[in-house]
């Protein structure tokens, strides 16, 4: 999937995101401004296939986006619920590294790995934090 095809797909499903569509649009605009590779770290993964209006699908959205960017772009996600990780792995591509466990420990270890590898995180997303993005 190239960037044009990503936006064709995203524009088709955007209405299913409800009020979150504006935030995801802003996120992807921001990511478009960054050089490859795009590295996204997420806490709390997709939990139910097709649940765009609820708490999920960010993992799928980020998966499709990073696939469209290519060049080593990747998503790292962690969830403490093994069932959620199982469902997530059934929906997303191998471009998403899924980890079962406590996010604090996972993020600490991932940070150490990224320091050694000199990997820069493009975007951090957590379903546990609610924030307001200024939409202009």
Region roles according to the model:
Residues 1-136:
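A short alpha-helical cap/connector motif
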